[in-house]
Structure formats: C-alpha cells, structure tokens
C-alpha cells in the first residue's frame, strides 16, 4: 500500500545517503585528506588548550556537537566550521605583558614625534596612572587636531612604548551598525564585526586599538554605528561586548582605545 511504499522509498534514500557518505570518507582517506570526524576531534583537542570561562567552553562544546551531527555536504557545515574556527582563533583571556618604563616611553614618543609636548605629557600621565593602578580599566584617549599632525602614528608609538600589539580601524564613511557588531551567522556570507576581527588579528585581548576618524561616522537605515561604539567604549558595558556573529560576550575592558 501507499504507506509501505513511502517507508521503503525513505529507507532507500537514507541507505543511499549513508553509502555515499562512507564512499566519500574512504575517498578522502585515500587522498590523504582529513575526514570530518578527524576535523571535529582536532577542534576538540585545540579547545582543551584554551583559557576559556565555563560559559564559553560549554557553548563551544554544544556548537561542536551540532557540527558533528551535520552532513559535511550542506552549506551550513562550512558556516559552522568557520564559526568554531573563530572561537579557536580569538585570544580569549590572553594578554601581553605591559612594559611600564616611563623613561623608555618618553624616548619612543620623542623619537617618533617632534614637538607635541602637551600631548606627550598627557600620554605619560596616563601610563603612570596605569602603572600605579594595574586593576584600573584602560583609559580612552581622544586625540584631536588637523590632518597630518601625527594623531594616528601616536597610537602606534603608545603601543610600542607599552609593549602591546597595535590595531587600527578606519571609521571614515562607516554607515552600517553591523560593521561594528557583525552579522548573525544565519546570513550567507556573515562575518564578525571589525572589533572582533581586529582582536583576532592582534592575537591578544589587550592591544592598543586606534579608532581612526571617529568624527566621520554617519548613521543610515542600517543603524547607527556610533550607538554600537558606545558599548565598545563604555567601561561599564565593554566587559561583555556582544557580537552578533560570535553570539557570546567578549571582554574588551583591558583594550586601550585611542580615538582620533
């Protein structure tokens, strides 16, 4: 009857799918490629080396189990793999050691920038306060002045003086809030926001982060990036900055932001 024929056709299609999976797995092994079970196991081993909080570790394991149940041929599999790769590549709780040598910092600032005595004095003051109160949230410096006076390069000198990594994003002409917060991973071609991408590139969670041309931000129908930056820069909120792609809070409180 009709039910039996439907059940039989369903079983046939499942058996065919299983047979093709096994065939593909064997071909991958013959070619010397990594089978997707090995890929999952490799990710699990890498995750064991990470200094994650319990929440992050549980979330990662849950998402990894989800990937394990997926068919490697579907588009969602590669999205899920990219998502888990991002988790493994981000520098969770990995900080570089600060160098609080104020004389050395003064020499680096003098070497790279002629004049600007008042600005350099304020920067050294900030570094002195950070040295005395190590538990203090990183200050946000805002450098204001005409083009070409060395605002952006001053951020690079501060990073060198502190022994921190240096990252910079240009905010000029940015109109979409998703540039800061990222897109939800359900969208095709979704990416994390520029903040999370830059931290991945820096390799530490406490770089000197230059936000260039902050006054050139403009809002549009896609949202207001300036409002999204408030969560990035507010010391009360940035301990748990939420990126739409990451779907987890990320601690930005140790990042030293320099706006120009």
Task: Describe the role of every protein-language-model region.
Residues 72-73, 92-96, 130-137, 165, ...:
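Active-site phosphate-binding and catalytic loops of NTP-dependent enzymes
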Residues 135-141, 205-207, 255:
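Pre-Walker A (Motif I) flank of P-loop NTPase domains
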Residues 137-171, 200, 230, 234:
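Walker A/P-loop
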Residues 143-145, 182, 213:
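The Walker A (P-loop) glycine that initiates the GxxxxGKT/S ATP-binding motif of P-loop NTPases
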Residues 161-191, 198, 218:
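AAA+/P-loop NTPase substrate/partner-engagement loops
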Residues 186-211, 242-249:
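Conserved alpha-helical scaffold flanking the Walker A/P-loop in AAA+ ATPase domains
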């Amino acid at each position: 009857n009709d039910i039996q024929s439907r059940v039989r056709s369903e079983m046939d299609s499942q058996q065919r799918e299983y047979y093709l999976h096994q065939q593909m797995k064997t071909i991958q092994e013959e070619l010397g490629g990594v089978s997707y079970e090995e890929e999952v196991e490799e990710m699990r081993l890498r995750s064991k080396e990470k200094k994650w909080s319990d929440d992050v570790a549980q979330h990662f394991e849950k998402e990894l189990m989800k990937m394990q149940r997926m068919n490697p041929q579907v588009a969602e599999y590669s999205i899920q793999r990219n998502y888990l790769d991002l988790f493994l590549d981000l520098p969770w709780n990995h900080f570089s050691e600060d160098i609080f040598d104020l004389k050395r910092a003064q020499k680096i600032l003098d070497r790279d920038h002629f004049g600007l005595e008042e600005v350099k004095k304020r920067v050294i003051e900030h570094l002195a306060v950070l040295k005395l109160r190590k538990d203090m949230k990183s200050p946000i410096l805002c450098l204001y002045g005409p083009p070409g006076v060395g605002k952006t390069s001053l951020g690079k000198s501060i990073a060198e003086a502190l022994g921190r990594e240096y990252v910079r994003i240009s905010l000029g002409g940015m109109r979409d809030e998703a540039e800061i917060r990222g897109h939800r991973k359900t969208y095709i071609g979704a990416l994390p926001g520029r903040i999370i991408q830059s931290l991945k590139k820096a390799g530490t969670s406490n770089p000197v982060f230059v936000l260039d041309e902050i006054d050139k931000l403009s809002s549009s129908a896609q949202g207001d990036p300036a409002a999204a930056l408030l969560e990035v820069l507010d010391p009360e909120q940035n301990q748990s900055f939420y990126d739409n792609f990451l779907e987890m809070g990320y601690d930005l409180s140790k990042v030293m932001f320099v706006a120009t």
